């Protein structure tokens, strides 16, 4: 089943229990969540090989992790009709979050290798999409900051209007 909306991914940073976290999520899913046909949340996680001291991604490892993400998302979407809603990076781990129709005993069976990383997974019922709404989605202040950053990016790409310096 194709997603009923055009994805709109963006990121923001937060702190949880004095730990730095980066969150990347599909902002557009908010207007459609929960999706009744996808009541199960599935997390796929990898331990980073070279995290920074603050637990976030090391620039040298980022390309490998982005490639792993592309592989995992494609597998989950094509094999399990999963809806990819976001990624959390913290404490030396990258965790991808999906919503699926039902829990399966081995959701990563047949997934392409993403060596040198080993995949871990968990799933649980989340019919109201509470994880997406209450954890992934930014609070009002972080959401306003994210939207402000987008506005500045648009203005920067468009160039400075005449008379404004």
Predicted regions and their residues:
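Charge-rich, low-complexity segments
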Residues: 1-93, 99-107, 116-164
